[in-house]
Curated annotation (Swiss-Prot):
Coiled coil: none
Keywords: Developmental protein, Differentiation, Phosphoprotein, Spermatogenesis
Record-listed Phosphoserine modification sites: S103
Pfam families attached to this UniProt entry: MEA1 (PF06910)
Biased composition (Acidic residues): 38-48, 65-77, 101-110
Listed name of the protein: Male-enhanced antigen 1
Any single GO BP term: cell differentiation
Keyword ATP-binding applies: no
Native source species: Sus scrofa (Pig)
Domain of life from the UniProt record: Eukaryota
InterPro entries to which the protein is assigned, alphabetical: MEA1
Length: 174
C-alpha cells in the first residue's frame, strides 16, 4: 500500500511514521536490523493528481448546454439499412433464423393464450399433483391479511369466478 504524504508526515496503512528529517525522540528511534515492515513491494506514488489505478484519470464532461451538434450520417432507405445489417451479420459469421410467417390464426391463438392464463395443458395426474402440493402450502399468520381471514373459501371462490367471467366478457384491446 502506498504511503500518502500529508503536511510533511508520511502515513502508512496501519501506523503513522515520522518523517526522516524530523528528530526522533528517545523511545521512537529506529532499531538496527529492522527491514521493510511489509511483505508487499513498495508502490510508486502517483505523480499526477487525479490519476487512478492503471493510468486512468477523471475527466469532467462538458456541462455547457451549448455543445457542438454531432452530425449523424444520413440514413438511406430502409432496404439499404437492412441489407447493410445483413451484410455485417454474414461478415461476422452469425446466422439469424428466418422470421416466422405471419398468419391471422397465430395472432388469435396468441391473444387468446395471453388473455386466458388457464390454458396451460395438463394431464389429470399433473392436476392432482398441483392440488396436493398447493394443499400443503400454508402462510404464516402475519402473512395473511385481515380481509382474507374474514372471508370463507366458498365466498373467495365466488369472487374469483365473477372476476374471471368479467375479464372474459371484456374485449381484449390490441
Amino acid at each position: 500500500m502506498a504511503a500518502v504524504v500529508l503536511g510533511g508526515d508520511i502515513m502508512g496503512p496501519e501506523r503513522i511514521f515520522p518523517n526522516q528529517t524530523e528528530e526522533l525522540g528517545p523511545h521512537q528511534g529506529p532499531t538496527e536490523g529492522t527491514g521493510d515492515w511489509s511483505s508487499e513491494e513498495p508502490e510508486e506514488e502517483q505523480e499526477e493528481t487525479g490519476t487512478g489505478p492503471a493510468g486512468y484519470s477523471y475527466q469532467p464532461l462538458n456541462q455547457d448546454p451549448e455543445q457542438e451538434e454531432v452530425e449523424l450520417a444520413p440514413v438511406g432507405d430502409g432496404e439499404d439499412v437492412v441489407a447493410d445489417i445483413q451484410d455485417r451479420i454474414q461478415a461476422l459469421g452469425l446466422h439469424l433464423p428466418d422470421p416466422p410467417l405471419e398468419s391471422e390464426d397465430e395472432d388469435e391463438e396468441g391473444a387468446t393464450a395471453l388473455s386466458n392464463h388457464s390454458s396451460i395443458p395438463m394431464d389429470p395426474e399433473h392436476v392432482e399433483l398441483v392440488k396436493r402440493t398447493m394443499a400443503g402450502v400454508s402462510l404464516p399468520a402475519p402473512g395473511v391479511p385481515a380481509w382474507a381471514r374474514e372471508i370463507s373459501d366458498a365466498q373467495w371462490e365466488d369472487v374469483v369466478q365473477k372476476a374471471l367471467q368479467a375479464r372474459q366478457a371484456t374485449p381484449a384491446w390490441k
